[in-house]
């Protein structure tokens, strides 16, 4: 396992210097190809973490992961006009909440958005998006062709990250051994193989909001809201949400309150989740229009911001109202049932 060709780049990192986007692409491409020892990988990730990753380094790492990903056939290979939105969080916020972004994906799709949600097994909560979907019989490892058909027919598909990003497995043991956040914690939401034009992206730290918006701009995302909601990696119902909105090539920063979104404040304890089976019951109740007010509102403000970002609603408040009416209609639950059926029709 030779890393001779990237040793000069590693030396730059060990000296506390920054890599260019192209250099970061090269070093992460080597990692994905399995050309890097675990010791070297650990040294690289820690060197980046201690200095603090730059916009170019995060962008270059994302470029490498995107280039190596299994193709999603719906994508036209760039960000031109596919109309797709992703509602995603980095995870790792330390709170064990209900599956807000996953549930919001069904609501946004039922309200007319085209949602390709890129997800993985749980990071911080007891039940990540894929854990929840398995409870409903949705085939997590559906082939790219099946996922594309789901997106065409139902406006919604789920892309299971390990199915598209095989090379990430090389970093698994090192990430577990380091027991600390690394660049990989923010890469997941940036490497959706559907290349969404629009994104609602939640981050685990307020310090990441602006940098990740800048990365999305560098990666060619058309419109996005990067959010951190009072400790959560999503739009908050229990406090203020920091936002960096990317629109027309500009990034503007502001804060949103629940009142701005047209809903009352709630306590974080009102959103506590459980094991996958319990969270599935909660999600089903919300999607049938029978959830608690706090649950429905938490999902609606996130779905609403996604509806705003992709242009279906002209404000976050209008988006939230549309999301709430969609929840009450039960359309989102019908969509869940249809997705379970279509996703499991053609198992590979």
From Swiss-Prot:
Mg(2+) 1 binds at residues 101, 234. Its cofactor is Mg(2+). 5-phospho-alpha-D-ribose 1-diphosphate binds at residues 89, 92-93, 97, 99-102, 117-125, 129. Its EC number is 2.4.2.18. This is Anthranilate phosphoribosyltransferase. It comes from Shewanella sp. (strain W3-18-1). Anthranilate 1 binds at residues 89, 120. Anthranilate 2 binds at residue 175. Homodimer. Keywords: Amino-acid biosynthesis, Aromatic amino acid biosynthesis, Glycosyltransferase, Magnesium, Metal-binding, Transferase, Tryptophan biosynthesis.
């Amino acid at each position: 396992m030779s890393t001779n060709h990237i040793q000069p780049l590693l030396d730059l990192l060990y000296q506390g210097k920054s890599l260019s986007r192209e250099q970061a692409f090269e070093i992460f491409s080597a990692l994905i190809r399995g050309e890097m020892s675990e010791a070297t990988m650990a040294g690289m990730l820690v060197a980046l973490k201690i200095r603090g990753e730059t916009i170019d380094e995060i962008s270059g790492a994302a470029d490498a992961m995107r280039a190596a990903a299994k193709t999603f056939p719906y994508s036209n290979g760039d960000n031109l006009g596919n109309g797709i939105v992703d509602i995603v969080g980095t995870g790792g916020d330390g709170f064990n909440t209900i599956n807000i972004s996953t549930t919001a994906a069904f609501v946004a799709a039922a309200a007319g958005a085209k949602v390709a949600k890129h997800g993985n097994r749980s990071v911080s909560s007891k039940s990540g998006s894929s854990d929840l979907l398995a409870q409903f019989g949705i085939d997590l490892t559906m082939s790219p062709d099946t996922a594309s058909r789901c997106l065409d027919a139902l406006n919604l598909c789920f892309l299971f990250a390990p199915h598209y990003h095989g090379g990430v497995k090389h970093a698994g043991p090192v990430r577990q051994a380091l027991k600390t956040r690394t660049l990989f914690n923010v890469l997941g939401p940036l490497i959706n193989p559907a290349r969404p034009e629009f994104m609602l992206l939640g981050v685990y730290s307020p310090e990441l909001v602006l940098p990740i918006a800048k990365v999305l701009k560098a990666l060619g995302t058309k419109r996005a809201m990067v959010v951190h909601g009072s400790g959560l990696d999503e739009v908050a119902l229990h406090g203020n949400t920091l936002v960096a909105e990317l629109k027309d090539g500009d990034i503007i920063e502001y804060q949103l309150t629940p009142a701005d979104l047209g809903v009352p404040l709630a306590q974080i304890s009102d959103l506590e989740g459980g094991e996958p089976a319990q969270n599935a019951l909660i999600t089903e109740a919300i999607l049938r229009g029978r959830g608690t007010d706090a649950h429905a509102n938490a999902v609606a403000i996130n779905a609403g911001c996604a509806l705003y970002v992709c242009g279906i609603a002209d404000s976050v408040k209008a988006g939230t109202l549309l999301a709430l009416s969609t929840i009450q209609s039960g359309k989102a639950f019908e969509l869940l049932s249809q997705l379970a059926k279509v996703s499991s029709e053609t198992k590979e």
